[in-house]
């Protein structure tokens, strides 16, 4: 449970900061759909560094919030994706989305343009030739309620480069499978999830594994490379 529950720590999952000084605060330039979402318990603290943008993916066929992402337009990388599991969205009603004729396998994020007016993300930076896969941070397998929600997980802004042995067949994959198995059985009403990778340099890039060369990626902080 949240608040006074028993989800860990001496305070039983309840913050001692009654004023919630770490809460996300809406800014004047935020679209209304973002303002409405950033107070959700699944949302981590937004970076607010001038180049990061919260993108909220709504399912307009149902009015449901599908998932949200923080996109760093300087790094040309997403920082995390967050979403919820509850009885209203865990049903597996559709198969894995497949692009139709003329569609990209990993579409550009239309909400990045509609919500923030950003149109310069027009490349696929994933260095697949160097052993990386397109890693869904909000997994497509977690969003099978309908095809709208399923397709949104394939947006490039939901991707980070991932090693298959760890992420698609190893520890990460097992964690996701375990979460999916437990989600329909949870006693409380909602499971709040946030996942991502570390892309923020600290000191001399000590939080980054490194940069992988990818000639197509010309607009990143380090041209020709992407952070991993």
Regions found by a protein language model. Give the residues of each.
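Domain-level detector for secreted/extracellular nuclease and nuclease-toxin modules, and
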Residues: 1-228
